[in-house]
């Protein structure tokens, strides 16, 4: 059977990690994979994470399954962190996923189940893994103008003109903050216009929230996300805890859906959980319990 296969292309970002490790020059700088490092080139474990882990080990009583949606305390804490009291929670559902990538995967599967072969619009450029995840989910990928290499800013007028021409069967993937890979971010005023455009056209906003807190702080970085989800009846958010909690190898993320009303939220969540059950079945708990412990404790937070 396997003789029909050809070698798949390697991941360019991960390949850079190997090249960096093999480079003997002392002045080298790693601009590859998005991992926080200190001045010594080490990705440290946060003190709050260590304290949370100690508490978990001391108080843990079971290793039984969590359920398809994952750690409920984690889910509630993440919704408080990301959305605050912005929305009526009866419209919101959340499911734990293995990292931000896992969140993107299950949510794109959900989109394709709702609108088979839908078009998802991504920024030019975007995180390299967005496209294969979308394509492997059955979606059609197109790009909207974004980065201006000369000014190192956003081609906002062109971006907005493209968004204004979309319709209710289109999905728009937005970087909630800290645009990867360009670092060129929308201003609050530009986010206001994007939100108004999405509300007008009915296109579905899909927000990748991988770096919350790494730009101008938690509240400032959440502005665009909150503005958009407050303006539209439906939205999706892929949250990652890898960066802001330093839990890269724990693979902890969350898939958040916002529906028109509670009844539609229940239906949509049932489909999301069905997708999860047919893929990784249930998520691991350790990273989720770390984040829950930190967010529920004022001292650790």
Segments predicted by a language model, with ranges:
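Short beta-strand segments
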Residues: 32, 175, 239
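Alpha-helical subdomain
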Residues: 212-226, 274-281
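Conserved core of the PLP fold type I
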Residues: 54-55, 61-199, 212-214, 223, ...
């Amino acid at each position: 059977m396997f003789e029909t296969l050809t070698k798949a292309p390697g991941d360019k970002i991960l390949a850079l990690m190997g090249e960096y490790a093999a480079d003997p020059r002392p002045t080298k700088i790693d601009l590859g994979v998005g991992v926080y490092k200190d001045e010594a080139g080490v990705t440290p474990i946060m003190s709050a994470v260590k304290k949370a882990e100690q508490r978990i080990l001391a108080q843990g009583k079971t290793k039984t399954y969590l359920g398809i949606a994952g750690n409920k305390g984690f889910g509630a804490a993440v919704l408080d962190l990301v959305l605050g009291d912005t929305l009526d929670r009866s419209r919101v559902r959340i499911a734990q996923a293995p990292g931000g990538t896992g969140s993107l995967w299950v949510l794109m599967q959900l989109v394709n189940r709702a609108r088979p072969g839908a078009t998802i619009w991504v920024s030019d450029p975007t995180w390299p893994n967005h496209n294969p995840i979308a394509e492997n989910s059955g979606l059609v990928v197109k790009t909207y103008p974004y980065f201006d290499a000369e000014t190192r800013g956003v081609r906002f007028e062109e971006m907005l003109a493209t968004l204004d021409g979309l319709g209710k069967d289109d999905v728009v993937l937005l970087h909630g903050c800290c645009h990867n890979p360009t670092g060129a971010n929308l201003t609050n005023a530009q986010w206001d216009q994007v939100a108004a455009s999405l509300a007008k056209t009915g296109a579905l906003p899909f927000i990748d929230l991988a770096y919350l807190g790494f730009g101008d702080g938690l509240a400032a970085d959440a502005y665009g996300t909150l503005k958009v989800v407050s303006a539209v009846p439906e939205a999706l958010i892929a949250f990652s805890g890898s960066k802001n909690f330093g839990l890269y190898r724990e693979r902890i993320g969350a898939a958040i859906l916002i529906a028109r009303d509670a009844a539609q939220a229940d239906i949509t969540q049932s489909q999301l959980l069905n997708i999860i059950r047919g893929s990784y079945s249930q998520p691991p708990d350790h990273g989720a319990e770390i984040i829950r412990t930190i967010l529920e404790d004022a001292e650790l937070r």
